[in-house]
UniProtKB/Swiss-Prot annotation:
The keyword ATP-binding applies. CDD domains: HprK_C. This is HPr kinase/phosphorylase. The gene is hprK. It holds the Pfam family Hpr_kinase_N.
């Protein structure tokens, strides 16, 4: 559970008052700037969000009659409010401090500009409060592309990852990949702390990739862009030989590109995955070899049909 205390420590913010409320949970990634509330409109006050008070809000507040100031701040400090942050190093109003002491609402001061701090907070909250899941597989950074290797147990996922590491790529997680959906279409995978940097090879045991290959051979987390699913070669199955068929794998609410690679003796799976990663990058750049080949093939068919008619 994300609490105000963790927010303060992670972002190096300064707590002014309301220490008793540091254990309040933060459940919302949205941040509020209570401008209308300063004017007295609390009908739709999002009290469960972190509140930011910048120059605009406080300059308006200072124009209020003295008899209204205390009531506004008391309404602002609710039991469910995680924190009220005063930005730009501004001095918090005395009425706010009093309301904080009465309701134990944490008051935090920051030197950052309001917009800059809002950006930092949003990034932090989206990461911490993102939806999570875990998958059985191996995550490797191949040419800058986060490749999630999946398949049945014993198919050779870890051995393939070891070969990729030897070829200069970086291991993120083996066996169990913890996945967070940071935003729409952005999945980030990382290993559980218990098996960080470790790789299990049947017949050899558990090896520490960072110790064997150096710090450049591992990553703590990586955005997942491509899924390579390994399966035993099935002679009765028609595999994609051109690349026009687009498969996807849905993880949480995000779909990523999926490629199914049949495995049998003599196939260098690590090299195939390298080529798949490079080809994925080309596709992002708008270069699709399969589509170009299909267009050339259609043009050739049209030319031949015209010749036969003549």
């Amino acid at each position: 559970m994300l609490t105000t205390d963790r927010l303060v420590n992670t972002l190096n913010l300064e707590l002014l008052t309301g220490e008793e409320g540091l254990d309040r949970p933060i459940k919302n990634t949205d941040i509020s700037r209570p401008g209308l509330e300063m004017a007295g409109y609390f009908s739709h006050y999002a009290s469960d969000r972190i509140q930011l008070l910048g120059t605009t809000e406080l300059s308006f507040y200072n124009l209020l009659p003295d008899e209204e100031k205390k009531g506004r701040m008391r309404k602002l400090c609710r039991p469910e409010t995680p924190a009220i942050i005063v930005t730009r190093g501004l001095e918090p109003p005395e009425e706010l401090i009093q309301a904080s002491q009465e309701t134990h609402t944490p008051i935090i001061v920051a030197k950052d500009a309001t917009t800059s701090l809002m950006s930092r907070l949003t990034t932090f909250l989206e990461h911490e409060l993102a939806k999570t899941t875990s998958l059985h597989g191996v995550l490797v950074d191949v040419y800058g592309v986060g490749v999630l290797i999946t398949g049945d147990s014993g198919i050779g996922k870890s051995e393939t990852a070891l070969e990729l590491v030897k070829r200069g790529h970086r291991l993120v997680a083996d066996d169990n990949v913890e996945i967070k959906e940071i935003t729409k279409d952005e999945l980030v995978g990382k290993p559980p702390k218990l098996i960080e940097h470790l790789l299990e090879i049947r017949g050899l045991g558990i090896i520490n990739v960072m110790t064997l290959f150096g710090a450049g051979s591992i990553l703590t987390e990586k955005q997942i862009r491509l899924n390579i699913n390994l399966e035993n070669w099935n002679k009765n199955k028609l595999y994609d030989r051109v690349g026009l068929n687009e498969e996807t794998l849905k993880i949480l609410d995000t779909e990523i590109t999926k490629k199914t690679i049949p495995v049998r003796p003599g196939r260098n799976v690590a090299v195939i995955i390298e080529v798949a990663a490079m080809n994925y990058r080309l596709n992002i750049m708008g270069i699709n070899t399969a589509v170009e080949f299909n267009e050339r093939l259609n043009e050739e068919i049209v030319r031949n049909s015209h010749k036969s008619e003549e």
